[in-house]
Amino acid sequence: AETLSPASSPTSLPVGEWHHCLPSQSGLLPEIDNALEYPQPALKSARDSDAPDVFGSVAVPVAHTPLDTKWQSASQAKLVSSSGPWAQMLKSASGQSRTVKVRAVNNWVNGHVRFTDDRANRQGADRWSGAAETLRSRRGDCEDYAIAKMKLLEAIGVERGDMYLVIVDDLVRRADHALLIVRIGDQMWVLDNETDKILNA
C-alpha cells in the first residue's frame, strides 16, 4: 500500500453528531504490523474528551463542511444486516471482540469491493454511495469503502460515536483519500481500502 500523508487541513467527519476539522500537522501515517495484537502506548487517552486524537492532532468541532450533503445521504441509507452478501461475515463476527470485528469487516470489504473511481465513470462527478449499494454492486471508491465499513461495524455493535470518516491528502497520487477511523480501547485505528493491515492513527 502507498504511504499516506495527512493534508495540511484534513477533514474528519464523525459518524456521531459533530463534524470535525483536524488542525495542521506533519509526518507520515505509520504502518504497524500486527498493530492490534501489540498496540503502542497512547500518548493521551482518546476518551479524555469528546474530540478524537487522530494523526497526533485533536479534532475541533465545526458546524458545517462542504461535504455535509453527501455525508447525510450516504450515512442515512439503510443496511439490513441479515440480508445481503455480507450476512454470513457479520454473523461470524457478531459477539467477538471489537478487534476481531474491525479486522473481519476491513478484510471482507477490501476483498469484496473493486475500486472504481467515480470521477472516471461519471464525467467528473464524485458521488458518495450508501453501504448496501456499494456492497451489492461490488464497486466503489475510497469513501464508499469507508462508509460501507462503518455501516457494517455499526450493524454488529460498534457505536457510531467511536467511528470517524476522515479525508486526507494522498501526496503520492495527489488526490483526496477517505479513511475510516475506529476507536478500540484508548487507541484510534485506521481502516484503509489500500491495505488489509490495520494502521495506527
Language model: regions and residue ranges:
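A structural boundary/capping signal
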Residues: 1-201
